[in-house]
């Protein structure tokens, strides 16, 4: 297998909602035609109507995508690798809580209840809470994204 120096990211415009179907067809064409100039096919999860191909040149992208029903064409220009990683990486802003903080549970079976943070397990993204609205002390472990800070 040849080692290609230049890997560029090209954007295919496709019919909205057909991104996964187009990606599967592209994958099948790449395998059956033994094309080694395309390195990856990316379907950005939050962007409708686009499929990103990592390839050596635009001629390869046009060759492999020609004749596919839902492909509208190749977008002009290239896209940077940093932009592609931004599209596909999962970045969730977790609330900053520490022991002793008052929080409100925003989802799950304890939704709407006030609680006090007993312990934060940052490796698991979980928090141990003491529910304040119960008649006896109840400690529960919930995911960190299910709480919202109220007071410190």
Swiss-Prot record:
SUPFAM superfamilies noted in UniProt: Translation proteins SH3-like domain
GO aspect biological process, one term: transcription elongation-coupled chromatin remodeling
Pfam families: KOW, Spt5-NGN
Location of the KOW domain: 99-129
Entry annotated with the keyword Transcription regulation: yes
GO molecular function, one term: translation elongation factor activity
Official protein name in the record: Transcription elongation factor Spt5
Transmembrane segments: none
């Amino acid at each position: 297998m040849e080692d290609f120096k230049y890997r560029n990211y090209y954007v295919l415009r496709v019919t909205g909602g057909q991104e996964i179907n187009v990606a599967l067809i592209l994958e099948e064409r790449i395998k059956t035609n033994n094309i080694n100039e395309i390195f990856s096919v990316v379907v950005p999860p939050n962007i409708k109507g686009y499929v990103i191909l990592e390839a050596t040149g635009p001629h390869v992208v046009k060759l492999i995508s020609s004749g596919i029903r839902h492909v509208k064409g190749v977008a002009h220009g290239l896209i940077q690798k940093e932009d592609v990683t931004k599209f596909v990486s999962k970045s969730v802003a977790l609330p900053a809580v520490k022991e002793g903080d008052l929080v409100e549970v925003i989802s799950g079976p304890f939704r709407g209840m006030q609680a006090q943070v007993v312990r934060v397990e940052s490796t698991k993204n979980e928090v141990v809470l003491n529910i304040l609205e119960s008649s006896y002390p109840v400690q529960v472990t919930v995911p960190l994204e299910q709480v919202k800070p109220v007071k410190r």
